Amino acid sequence: MVLSTEENRSVDLVNLPSVPLPDGEAGVGENNKDSLNNLCSQYEEKVRPCIDLIDSLRALGVEQDLALPAIAVIGDQSSGKSSVLEALSGVALPRGSGIVTRCPLVLKLKKLNQGEEWKGKVTYDDIEVELSDPSEVEEAINTGQNHIAGVGLGISDKLISLDVSSPHVPDLTLIDLPGITRVAVGNQPADIGRQIKRLITNYIQKQETINLVVVPSNVDIATTEALSMAQKVDPDGDRTIGILTKPDLVDRGTEDKVVDVVRNLVCHLKKGYMIVKCRGQQDIQEQLSLAEALQKEQVFFKEHPQFRALLEDGKATVPCLAERLTMELISHICKSLPLLENQIKESHQSTSEELQKYGADIPEDENEKTLFLIEKINAFNQDITAIVEGEEIVREKECRLFTKLRKEFFLWSEEIERNFQKGSDALYKEVYTFEMQYRGRELPGFVNYKTFENIIRRQIKTLEEPAMEMLHKVTEIVRAAFTTVSEKNFSEFFNLHRTTKSKLEDIRLEQETEAEKSIRLHFQMEQIIYCQDQIYRKALQKVREEEAEEEERKHGKSRSSQSKNLQTSSMDEIFQHLNAYRQEAHNRISSHIPLIIQYFILKMFAEKLQKGMLQLLQDKDSCSWLLKEHSDTSEKRRFLKERLARLAQAQRRLAKFPG
């Protein structure tokens, strides 16, 4: 909230805007304390529920699944970041040289009613440390960092949570991130700078995060690493707030430049800048209390000739910053809730679907385990039946097995046609040779039946190997389909899946051999030239009519009725008989070979596989072995169940939120 000039003029040492005040701090009058307790009073009814909602979702672990609205605090080392957080929270945080914040620290501030006692809690991993005094905070956080990141200067991306409840803090949640460093010092890892930047980027790149960039007033803001990192992930500055610190260290004569930065005239950010003056190292050595530091800050800005205007604009002091951050966080949460609700719903649905793939937990009881295996095998057999009947459920852009087989059978029909067409030239030459060289006592127009048989046999024989190729192709397609069913049902049970694949391979080999025998037998039978008389007559009549129509189309009725020479007429007669028989052979072979393949490679393959799977149930001793899972399957199932429970609880909390 930007305070009006009149509002700011009323701000004095006795009537500060509400700010955090550490319990037990001396030197502040009762009127001042009453004034300090007014922080966010105008928001109180809606502020706490909003922040509590997000904090509760974060405590559930929902942040493992999706991003939550947050304010992340970043800054270079020695930027004054810790001092700002101390001023906001009223507790002393770890200080020192080098990397002090070694784990992300979630600082949850909760405003209590006047008279209630200060409470604190530090949480990390499965450890909770209750605190009864603000002075215990620093040691508890250092202990937590040593536990998570190890004793030394290493860092970790695991969270430490600090809950502070007091009448003298704002309702606010911040995430403090390690200070940016460039050079490894002492026993720090050589790539410590890169590690810290990666950790910071993981937080500030999320669209749900407001980035609070802390920069000393006495440096060139355009060259600071923290602002540069924020600009990379938020180039328009839509979710970045700049905080200038250490205004008392600004060189004389450069104050106007600092004022220009705060007024957003140098590096533009849509959310703008604030400026604060917190305790410095000398103040700490002189044991200046946080409450006294707030009074000292108020005096500094009120009496400073250049910075006074920033106080009047509501852009200076920790109290104004606390109020601004609370307002920003609440606004950000309210804007994010609809999207967050949808994300939780979608994540819940996708997690449920993924959990279904892993199935239920394996029972411990042997009888129940047998029933579990029966259910699994029945489900597998039902899926196989659905494939054989062409009723399996497929995903978008996928096709059923029968669609794939139909395509292969269509190509087979085309292969027969292509084969006959390709043999026409050779056929003409052979018939011509017979007519000119080998015709015996036959009158013109009579075909030598032996020659007719030989021609037909040779042409049909050339189709045998293409039929074998189709058989192998279809077998592979069916094998792949059945293997997919096994993976779908048994992928988590490696022994059962392996046993199924072994059975599948044995039956495939057996059925492919049977199908090959049957196909070769069919081609042997095709060497017998035979067709029912009435069928052959119809085929011959059809060929003659088609040729007559074609002749009439080409040369007209008069030409077609003219007598042809005896040689041409005889050749035509032979070709008509050959074409008539080839058409009937085409019809037989194009249908019968796919029938053989479907019978052996689909129907019998499926039946034998299903029977083989049921036979597994006869050996009850192998039940546990067959149901042995991959080492990570039960862990994955447990993880998904926990996520599902988290998301379900999050949905319930969002549903209860008054909005």
UniProtKB/Swiss-Prot annotation:
Signal peptide: none annotated. Induction: By type I and type III interferons. Residues 571-659 form the GED domain. GO terms for biological process: cellular response to type I interferon; defense response to virus; endosomal transport; negative regulation of intracellular transport of viral material; negative regulation of viral genome replication; receptor internalization; regulation of cell cycle; regulation of nucleocytoplasmic transport. GTP binds at residues 75-82, 176-180, 245-248. Interferon-induced dynamin-like GTPase with antiviral activity against vesicular stomatitis virus (VSV). This is Interferon-induced GTP-binding protein Mx2. It comes from Rattus norvegicus (Rat).
